[in-house]
């Protein structure tokens, strides 16, 4: 687990997300509290629970990204789900325990990648031996192998085609019990049993020497790793460091005077209660306790209110942060200050065609103005509106770029208004096009 301070986490988030200071601080503190808990001993460590977060704000203002980025920074398993995808136990659909099973799968991938890095040097040497076997045969003399090894390391053999044998991981069929989503994971794991019964199956692949290395290094790494250790570590990481982001939680809040579907929505909330507080979920790798998993929930709450959630669920989300709608200045900063801003992306994309793009300050002002106006008059979709506007403005250049190698295009306010101004003013048209 990383030991970044809250200030460092917020500083990292500032590179990618504009504004939303309160939400950034809440997530940064929650992440730091994870590290603090790890420093405690015995009983106190067990007693310290994460303070789950409820983010309230319109779409496109950074809720998901504020949750995802710190998880990536900490190397923690992160899963994003939408509350509306789940149904009450007993109904057709996914049950909420699938969230934890997905989290464990992600944790296993993370741990395996980390362990592969530890054995990469040894795996690389083993992969080199297998490439030599494919090139000169296993019975070749040491002198011949050394001669080819030098050529290999100098890159002289990169384009030569060889045949390699690799593990056939996709050989076993995956069984699922009809009407019981996830049952193949928790109850029966016929796929694993069949895989073991059939032994380590391999398949032959034809590839170039250069392309064979990543495949063989992965194959050799897996041979050097203890899979049981990976699973145990992944279960621990899921329990102690896992982050679950549940979006659209407002859609399962029972609205006053509602009926029918409200029963099922309330059922999903009741199923979430034990998950968010403390339960043990059975996965095919073993049981996972959820009491130290951090849950971050979010919703726009346009129609319903946070108080429409079940009181018990509200109590399990003690930290509330409100995210503000984006202003004109926010849009300007999103276009110019973020690490991989849309403007930087389009400039880089056009450079691949040897076309140069330049944006004037008044063009950025015009783009921000149009995005704000459209969000106000059509539908507020936050920063995502900029993608639609930029795509419309640069449509002609993107289409003709292959024929304009060496050209320079200067995007100014006049160009932006020429391409989009009329559409933005015509509300009926902009509803369909922007």
Curated annotation (Swiss-Prot):
Pfam families: AAA, AAA_2. It comes from the Bacteria. Keywords: ATP-binding, Chaperone, Cytoplasm, Nucleotide-binding, Stress response. ATP binds at residues 18, 60-65, 247, 312, 384. GO terms for biological process: protein unfolding; proteolysis involved in protein catabolic process. GO terms for molecular function: ATP binding; ATP hydrolysis activity; peptidase activity; proteasome-activating activity. It is found in: Cytoplasm. One of its GO terms (cellular component) is HslUV protease complex. HAMAP family: HslU. A double ring-shaped homohexamer of HslV is capped on each side by a ring-shaped HslU homohexamer. The assembly of the HslU/HslV complex is dependent on binding of ATP. ATPase subunit of a proteasome-like degradation complex; this subunit has chaperone activity. The binding of ATP and its subsequent hydrolysis by HslU are essential for unfolding of protein substrates subsequently hydrolyzed by HslV. HslU recognizes the N-terminal part of its protein substrates and unfolds these before they are guided to HslV for hydrolysis. PANTHER family: ATP-DEPENDENT CLP PROTEASE ATP-BINDING SUBUNIT CLPX-LIKE, MITOCHONDRIAL-RELATED, ATP-DEPENDENT PROTEASE ATPASE SUBUNIT HSLU. Belongs to the ClpX chaperone family. HslU subfamily. This is ATP-dependent protease ATPase subunit HslU. It comes from Brucella ovis (strain ATCC 25840 / 63/290 / NCTC 10512). The lineage of its organism: Bacteria, Pseudomonadati, Pseudomonadota, Alphaproteobacteria, Hyphomicrobiales. The gene is hslU.
């Amino acid at each position: 687990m990383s030991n970044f301070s809250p200030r460092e986490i917020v500083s990292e988030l500032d590179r990618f997300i504009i504004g939303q200071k309160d939400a950034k601080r809440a997530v940064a503190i929650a992440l730091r509290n994870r590290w603090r808990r790890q420093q405690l001993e015995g009983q106190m460590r067990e007693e310290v629970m994460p303070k789950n977060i409820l983010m309230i704000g319109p779409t496109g203002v950074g809720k998901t990204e504020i949750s995802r980025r710190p998880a990536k920074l900490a190397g923690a398993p992160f899963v994003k789900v939408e509350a509306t995808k789940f149904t009450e136990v007993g109904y057709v659909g996914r049950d909420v325990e699938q969230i934890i099973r997905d989290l464990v799968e992600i944790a296993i991938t993370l741990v395996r990648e980390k362990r592969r890095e530890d054995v990469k040097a040894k795996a690389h040497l083993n992969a080199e031996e297998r490439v030599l076997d494919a090139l000169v045969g296993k019975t070749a003399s040491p002198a011949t192998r050394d001669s080819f090894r030098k050529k290999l390391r100098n890159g002289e053999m990169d384009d030569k085609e060889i045949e390699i044998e690799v593990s056939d991981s996709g050989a076993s069929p995956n069984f699922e019990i009809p009407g019981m989503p996830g049952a193949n994971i928790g109850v029966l794991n016929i796929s694993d049993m069949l895989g073991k019964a059939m032994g380590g199956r391999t398949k032959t692949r034809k590839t170039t020497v250069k392309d064979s290395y990543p495949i063989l290094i992965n194959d050799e790494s897996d041979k050097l790793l203890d899979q049981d250790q990976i699973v145990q570590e992944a279960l621990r990481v899921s329990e102690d460091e896992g982050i679950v982001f549940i979006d659209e939680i407002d859609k399962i809040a029972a609205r006053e005077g509602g009926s029918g579907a409200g029963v099922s929505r309330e059922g999903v909330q009741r199923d979430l209660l034990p998950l968010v507080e403390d339960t043990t979920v059975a996965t095919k790798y073993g049981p996972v306790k959820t009491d130290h998993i951090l849950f971050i929930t979010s919703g726009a709450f346009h129609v319903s209110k946070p108080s429409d959630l079940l009181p018990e669920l509200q109590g399990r989300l003690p930290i509330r942060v409100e995210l503000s709608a984006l202003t004109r200045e926010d849009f300007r900063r999103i276009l110019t200050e973020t690490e991989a801003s849309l403007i930087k992306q389009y400039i880089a994309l056009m450079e691949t065609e040897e076309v140069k793009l330049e944006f004037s300050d008044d063009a950025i002002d015009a783009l921000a103005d149009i995005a704000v106006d459209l969000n106000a008059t059509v539908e507020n979709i936050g920063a995502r509106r900029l993608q639609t506007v930029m795509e419309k403005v640069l449509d002609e250049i993107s289409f003709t770029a292959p024929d304009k190698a060496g050209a320079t295009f200067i995007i100014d306010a006049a160009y932006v208004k020429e391409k989009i101004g009329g559409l933005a003013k015509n509300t009926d048209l902009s509803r369909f096009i922007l």
